[in-house]
């Protein structure tokens, strides 16, 4: 079984992946860790500041083939990140799809309305200052 966890930044993907790892003992891959490993090693010309579409276009083919390899070898894996394309399903046959569970985490308007200050507080904790703030 492959568990794909997608969603925008700060929606809880990593926390959910960690909880699923603890519960099911499945290996866990953060696409962000893969991204930074490739960037820091000089294996790609992208940077941490590259736009999400460029990063998705580069990372998804790698992740997609890792998923297929896991399924072909009857291995479980939790994969989380924001670099999963919206049309990811087109890359898999029905046989592969039977082995993939997809979860997309979002904030509902109601949640945002009632928790806006907390969302803002935590987003600001993890956001680098812009050059204008210097």
Cite the ranges covered by each PLM segment.
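Single conserved hydrophobic/aromatic residue that forms the stacking wall/gate
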Residues: 126-134
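Conserved substrate/cofactor phosphate-moiety recognition/catalytic segment
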Residues: 18, 22-58
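ATP-binding Walker
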Residues: 11
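Glycine-rich phosphate-binding loop used to anchor ATP phosphates in small-molecule kinases
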Residues: 55-97
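Conserved phosphate-donor/acceptor-positioning beta-strand/loop module used by diverse small-molecule
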Residues: 98-118
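P-loop (Walker A) phosphate-binding loop of NTP-binding proteins
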Residues: 8
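Hydrophobic anchor at the beta1->P-loop junction of P-loop NTPases
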Residues: 5
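Walker A/P-loop
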Residues: 14
């Amino acid at each position: 079984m492959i568990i794909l966890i997608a969603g925008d930044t700060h929606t809880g993907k990593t926390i959910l992946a960690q909880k699923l790892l603890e519960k099911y003992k499945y290996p866990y891959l953060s696409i962000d860790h893969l991204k930074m490993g490739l960037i820091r090693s000089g294996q790609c010309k992208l940077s941490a500041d590259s736009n999400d579409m460029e990063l998705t276009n580069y990372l998804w083919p790698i992740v997609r083939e890792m998923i297929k390899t896991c399924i072909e070898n009857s291995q479980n894996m939790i994969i989380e990140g924001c670099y999963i394309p919206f049309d990811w399903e087109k890359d898999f046959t029905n046989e592969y799809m039977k082995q993939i569970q997809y979860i997309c985490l979002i904030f509902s308007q109601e949640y945002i309305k009632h928790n806006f200050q907390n969302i803002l507080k935590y987003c600001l904790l993890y956001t680098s200052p812009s050059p204008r703030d210097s």
